[in-house]
Design a protein with these regions (language model features):
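Extracellular/luminal Protease-associated
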Residues: 80-125
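Structural motif
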Residues: 29-31, 52-55, 89-92, 119-123, ...
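A short alpha/beta connector and helix-capping loop motif
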Residues: 180-198
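Conserved small/polar residues in nucleotide/adenosyl-binding loops
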Residues: 207-213
Length: 217
């Protein structure tokens, strides 16, 4: 399956359905491959974020150790990185202050910038702010909400990250909505459409079950 068809197909489903499809592919239930805590969203939308991970790390609890010039350079490198060689980039940012995050990288300005760069959306364990002022065309799925940006700054790019128990590597296929996020290893991507079809058919069959039938299952 080509990338465009993969994105189109998986965008029709919510993230719990995607998790169920992975269970079908694996032939068993799993305790890995998805976020382990509740998340908040910038937009009240059920449309999922679907694409391939562009990763970074941030910190806000203390001032950066680098010079302002170095900080500006890494910010420019970040913008260049997230738009390079990927049609469907999803920005995934780990706040290394977690679980004591104090500064929001995601607010009115960064949402507008990332929307302008054609990023598909953001998943982070960090903070979100400027509610009510965020561009309606861009979704951020975050760990929590806070009022300040504190000393927030980028520390690493293109690196493995951990978002609420979900390990994500650069280039991983990611699917996220108001329920949280999950990833699908590349070796299983071709199996997704059939697995999703089986999940949907099984769900439909459940709607016809009577209580006595359920008790016998």
């Amino acid at each position: 399956m080509n990338t465009d068809q993969l994105i189109k197909t998986t965008s029709k489903y919510d993230t719990p359905t995607m998790c169920n499809a992975m269970d079908v592919i694996l032939g068993t239930r799993s305790a890995v491959g998805f976020t382990k805590s509740s998340m908040v969203t910038a937009q009240n939308s059920t449309q999922p974020i679907v694409g391939f991970a562009k990763t970074a790390k941030i910190r806000a609890s203390s001032p950066p150790l680098k010079s302002q010039k170095e900080i500006n350079n890494i910010r420019m490198e970040y913008y260049e990185y997230i738009v390079k060689n990927e049609k469907n980039p999803v920005v995934v940012v780990e706040d290394t202050d977690f679980p004591n995050c104090i500064g929001a990288f995601w607010g009115e300005l960064n949402v507008a910038v990332h929307k302008g760069l054609k990023i598909k959306g953001t998943v982070t364990n960090g903070l979100l702010r400027d509610l009510g002022m965020l561009d309606s065309g861009y979704q951020v799925i975050a760990g929590s909400i806070g009022p300040s940006h504190a000393f927030v700054h980028l520390t690493e790019l293109d690196t493995p990250v951990n978002i609420l128990g979900l390990e994500i590597k650069p280039g991983d296929f990611i699917h996220a909505d108001q329920h949280g996020a999950m990833t699908v290893p590349k070796k299983y991507l071709d199996a997704l459409p059939h697995a999703l079809d089986l999940v949907v058919k099984k769900a439909v069959s459940y709607t016809h079950l009577t209580l006595p039938t359920i008790l016998r299952v």
